[in-house]
Amino acid sequence: MGCCGCGSCGGCGGGCGGCGGGCGGGCGGGCGSCTTCRCYRVGCCSSCCPCCRGCCGGCCSTPVICCCRRTCGSCGCGCGKGCCQQKGCCQKQCCC
């Protein structure tokens, strides 16, 4: 289950439709060292989930440094449709 009370959102497609205010106001505590982040909006993700800090859209399904934009394709340094898998990739801005 994810943190911020968004674990019941279902899939990651289309953002976090069912969470609404749950992500907006409920991100203060209780997230701890989250190991799985799913369906978080960018604000919730960046302020609450250490494993997703620096997201630029979409969601994080594994503890990664940066989520790529939905339009991001493979850029040859750890990026794919979902997330950037390497810190250096995000820093080089080859996807995000």
Curated annotation (Swiss-Prot):
Gene Ontology CC annotations of this record: intermediate filament
Keywords: Keratin, Repeat
Top-level lineage group: Eukaryota
Ranges for region 14 X 2 AA repeats of CG: 4-80
Note: Human have a similar number of genes as other primates despite the relative hairlessness of humans.
Biological function: In the hair cortex, hair keratin intermediate filaments are embedded in an interfilamentous matrix, consisting of hair keratin-associated proteins (KRTAP), which are essential for the formation of a rigid and resistant hair shaft through their extensive disulfide bond cross-linking with abundant cysteine residues of hair keratins. The matrix proteins include the high-sulfur and high-glycine-tyrosine keratins.
Family label: Belongs to the KRTAP type 28 family.
Protein's UniProt name: Small cysteine and glycine repeat-containing protein 7
